[in-house]
């Protein structure tokens, strides 16, 4: 029985070391894969489903008629972020120096642009 426990603990250590090596090689601290975030636009009440998939974000706009459009946001180094960005409006994400510029997609009521500074994990 004790031999089985030793094998399990050794396997656990090996898995943790492999994970640490993979994370350091790819500079990944937080890996977000296929995480769904459901938000509502504060201005018009449109329901948004933001899907994080590796280094891409898919923003699905959900209306009464179902999904109207799918916005594929350009590649950004999102896996290095500590937490997901807030999505108060319909935004596209673009990396600019040390800030994240959220360029708004046309909203029925208005178009909003916003600079959001985000603390990024140093990899």
From Swiss-Prot:
Keywords: Membrane, Transmembrane, Transmembrane helix
The keyword Membrane is assigned to this record: yes
One Gene Ontology cellular component annotation held by this UniProt entry: membrane
Segments passing through the bilayer: 14-34
Membrane keyword on record: yes
Mode of membrane association: Single-pass membrane protein
Other information: Almost completely overlaps YPR078C.
Name of the molecule in the record: Putative uncharacterized protein YPR077C
